[in-house]
A protein has these predicted regions:
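Charged, solvent-exposed interaction patches on well-folded alpha/beta domains
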Residues: 1-229
C-alpha cells in the first residue's frame, strides 16, 4: 500500500526526531528514545472479536518492535496463516501503532473431511467450522472434490443465472460429474462433459412454463430426461 503524501511527511518528521534523540546521551532521553518508536498497539478491524483475539495473539511478537524497521512483508506472512482471510491492508501510524484491516473470505458451502465439518471458502481453502457461528443457509457438499473444481462449477452456474442460494445439496462423483438438489427438492443430474451447455439446458427448463418434475437428468449426451422421481 502506497503512503499518502501527508503520511510520508509524518514519517520524515518522526525520522528527524529519531535522528535528534539518537544524538542525545542523557539517560532519560535514552529511555524515551528506546520506547518512542516501538509498536505499542495493534488495531485490527473487519472481523468479529473471536477471530480478532486469535489474530492479535499471533501478532503479539510484533509489539515492541521498531515501527520504522518493521517489514510489512513479515506481517503479511503471519496473516497468510489464517485461511479465512481473503484480503488485508497494513498501515503504520507513527509513532507506535499498527492498523490492520481484514476482509474475510466468502463461505460458499459446508463439507466433511475425515469426519470433521469444514466450510468451503471462495479463496479456495477448507476452513474449520469452529472458526464461525453455524451457517445454516449454505449448501451441503458431498464427495471427494478439489475446491478449484467446485469454484469452476459455481462459476458456470452463476454465468447461467443460477441463484446459488437456491441450492440445498451438491454431490460430486468419481466420474467428475455433479448433482445438485434445489431447495424445492428438484434434483438435477449433470454429465461429466459439456457441462456448460447442460447447465444452460437445465436453466431453460426451470424457467419454462412446463410443470417441473422431481428430476432433470442430463447425463446422456443429446438427451433430456424429466421424471417424477
Amino acid at each position: 500500500m502506497h503512503l499518502s503524501k501527508n503520511n510520508k511527511n509524518i514519517k520524515y518528521f518522526y525520522l528527524l526526531i529519531l535522528i535528534f534523540i539518537s544524538s542525545v546521551n542523557n539517560y532519560n532521553f535514552q529511555i524515551f528514545k528506546n520506547n518512542l518508536f516501538k509498536v505499542s498497539k495493534i488495531n485490527i478491524s473487519g472481523v468479529e472479536n473471536k477471530l480478532k483475539n486469535e489474530i492479535n495473539l499471533n501478532l503479539e511478537s510484533f509489539k515492541n518492535k521498531n515501527i520504522f524497521f518493521l517489514d510489512k512483508k513479515i506481517i503479511s506472512e503471519e496473516l497468510k496463516k489464517f485461511n479465512y482471510i481473503e484480503h488485508y491492508s497494513i498501515f503504520k501510524k507513527y509513532p507506535s501503532e499498527l492498523y490492520i484491516d481484514l476482509k474475510l473470505t466468502k463461505l460458499i458451502g459446508t463439507t466433511f473431511k475425515n469426519n470433521k465439518k469444514f466450510y468451503v471458502g471462495s479463496n479456495k481453502k477448507f476452513i474449520s467450522s469452529t472458526k464461525f457461528k453455524e451457517k445454516s443457509n449454505l449448501p451441503n457438499i458431498f464427495g471427494d472434490f478439489e475446491i478449484i473444481e467446485l469454484i469452476n462449477f459455481f462459476d458456470l452456474l452463476e454465468e447461467n443465472n443460477f441463484n446459488l442460494k437456491d441450492i440445498k445439496q451438491i454431490y460430486f462423483f468419481e466420474s467428475k460429474r455433479w448433482d445438485i438438489i434445489l431447495k424445492n427438492d428438484l434434483l438435477i443430474k449433470f454429465p461429466s462433459s459439456n457441462l456448460d451447455n447442460s447447465i444452460k439446458i437445465a436453466k431453460n427448463i426451470i424457467d419454462s412454463d412446463l410443470e417441473l418434475k422431481k428430476v432433470i437428468d442430463l447425463r446422456v449426451s443429446n438427451q433430456v430426461i424429466i421424471r417424477d422421481e
